[in-house]
């Protein structure tokens, strides 16, 4: 199908009305809108990672409550809704208040209030933000004769940067708590209140008085309220898949598999349909390229800092983690573990749930996130991630994929001898993690500290019909590493794998901070 016959992908467009009127591709989520606004609670909160469709959902609610029935022609809600009542809508976008101090935050909130005060009026004596919010809600109700809808998108945006700062967090949190406080007192005047964010509302303690919010984030009926399911993609995006397949010179089936490996895998409850990252998927269709769009759209500096703070190794990220339901609601500002941040930020997702133990299993959702995380962690093991480093890793991949482990190790030896070495290089674990990161970047199966009946293998990697059993030594010899493999009979652990087992003993030169020598036995 020719490109001009397809609807445009709405890259960066988060306004429902603009998408519909501009004839952009829209994945119909209006059934969830109907379910939510006719549900048991008039106060709802949704947590999802960044760029996952929260703002578009909020905008959809805005159009619905504004009574813009024409925009919903042909969508699920058109058949479900029998009454299209127009309500006054107060829509606040807190993403405008990132990286701010107290004065700037108050100024931004005042600016957003003033826009609606021009419509409904402002009492002269009202100076405080909460008084102005209260007055605004009551005036809108009085002037229209209808209850008011309040939509707050990315409510936690002003606080994310200062989450663990003892000085700034309480100050900004008090401003936000004050701004949101009228939502409970004004309950008789409110038809619906909807808030979105990344962190759970209970974690920031700014809704301590508003205890009637329904958190729909992990409820099964709303599992696919944001993101794109496999069914939605294959029913509504077949032409885009076929065009991408032609561009990538792959079959449709191969393209579907690549899309699944790279962008799928999210679950926000269990059981749940597989959910694709909408930002990455739409960008892939718009550009006809399978690139890392979501990870590249935001540098996870804060995440990397927290991983270091909690001493989380790359290999621990590569394996699954387990968590109780309460762990998802642990106070973020007093975080004692990395699980809440990894999950809410979209770097980990739910992969399984044991109902008896009430235990969730979490893991990296897909290939894009795995590669992105490892690339972000690499500078911590190579001092800096240079262009030469990227080239070397690519050449190593080609060598190993071609069965030339010796050539790959020579490339790594040469590269490590030319870069500034990091701290903490005088222990085997540093190089073990370095190998883990590099092999993970290849998209290959890799694990460290693999248990066997007689010990633990430093590194195990599987590629191209071969399974590499790798032992690392520091300041000794490659022969000593190989002797250790043979003494512990590591290959026997993998004898039933059906793969050719290759033993690799590697010694690192302590003074030169690179590979000293190695022995390979097939």
Name these PLM-found stretches:
Residues 170-174, 474-491:
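Mg2+/Mn2+-dependent nuclease catalytic core
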Residues 179-186, 340-348, 436-440, 484-504:
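Metal-dependent nuclease catalytic cores in nucleic-acid-processing enzymes
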Residues 493, 499-522:
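Domain-level recognition of nuclease-like catalytic cores that cleave nucleotide substrates
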Residues 149, 466-468, 502:
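Structural motif
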Residues 139-144, 438-465:
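Active-site metal-binding core of divalent-cation-utilizing nuclease and nuclease-like domains
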Residues 435, 459-474, 488:
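Conserved catalytic cores of phosphodiester-cleaving nucleases, focusing on short active-site segments
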Residues 1-427, 442:
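Phosphate-binding site recognition
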């Amino acid at each position: 199908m020719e490109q001009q016959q397809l609807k445009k992908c709405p890259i960066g467009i988060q306004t429902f009305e603009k998408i519909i009127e501009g004839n952009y591709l829209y994945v119909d989520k209006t059934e969830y809108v109907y379910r939510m606004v006719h549900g048991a609670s008039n106060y709802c909160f949704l947590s999802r990672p960044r760029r996952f469709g929260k703002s578009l959902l909020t905008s959809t609610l805005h159009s619905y409550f504004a009574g813009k029935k024409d925009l919903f022609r042909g969508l699920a809600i058109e058949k479900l809704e029998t009454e299209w009542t127009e309500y006054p809508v107060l829509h606040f976008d807190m993403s405008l208040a990132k990286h701010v101090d107290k004065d700037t935050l108050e100024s931004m909130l005042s600016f957003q209030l003033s826009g609606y005060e021009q419509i409904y009026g402002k009492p002269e004596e009202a100076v405080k933000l909460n008084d102005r919010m209260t007055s605004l809600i009551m005036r809108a109700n009085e002037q229209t004769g209808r209850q008011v809808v309040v939509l707050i998108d990315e409510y936690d945006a002003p606080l994310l940067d200062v989450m663990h700062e003892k000085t700034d967090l309480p100050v900004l949190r008090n401003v936000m708590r004050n701004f949101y406080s009228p939502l409970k007192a004004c309950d008789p005047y409110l038809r619906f209140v909807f808030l979105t964010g990344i962190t759970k509302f209970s974690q920031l303690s700014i809704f301590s008085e508003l205890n009637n919010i329904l958190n729909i984030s992990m409820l099964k009926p709303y599992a696919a309220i944001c993101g794109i399911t496999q069914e939605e993609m294959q029913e509504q995006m077949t032409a885009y898949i076929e065009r991408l397949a032609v561009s990538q010179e792959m079959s449709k089936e191969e393209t579907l598999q690549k899309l699944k490996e790279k962008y799928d895998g999210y679950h926000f409850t269990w059981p749940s349909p597989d959910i694709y990252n909408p930002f990455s998927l739409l960008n892939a269709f718009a550009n006809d390229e399978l690139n890392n769009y979501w990870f590249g759209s935001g540098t996870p500096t804060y995440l990397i800092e927290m991983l270091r703070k909690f001493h989380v190794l790359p290999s621990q990220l590569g394996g699954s983690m387990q968590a109780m339901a309460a762990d998802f609601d642990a106070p973020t500002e007093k975080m004692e573990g990395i699980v809440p941040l990894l999950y809410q930020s979209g770097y980990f997702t739910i992969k399984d749930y044991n109902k008896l133990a009430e235990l969730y299993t979490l893991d990296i959702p897909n290939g894009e996130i795995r590669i992105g995380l490892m690339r972000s962690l690499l500078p911590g093991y190579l001092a800096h991630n240079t262009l030469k480093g990227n080239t070397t890793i690519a050449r190593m991949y080609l060598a190993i994929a071609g069965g030339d482990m010796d050539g790959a190790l020579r490339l790594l030896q040469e590269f490590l001898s030319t870069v500034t070495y990091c701290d903490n290089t005088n222990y085997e674990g540093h190089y073990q993690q370095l190998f883990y990161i590099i092999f993970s970047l290849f998209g290959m199966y890799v694990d460290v500290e693999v248990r066997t009946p007689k010990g633990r293998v430093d590194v195990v990697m599987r590629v191209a019909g071969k399974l590499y059993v790798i032992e690392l030594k520091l300041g000794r010899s490659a022969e000593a590493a190989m002797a250790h493999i043979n003494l512990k009979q590591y290959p026997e652990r993998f004898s039933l794998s059906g793969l050719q087992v290759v033993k690799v003993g590697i010694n690192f030169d302590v003074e030169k901070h690179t590979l000293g020598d190695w022995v390979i036995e097939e």
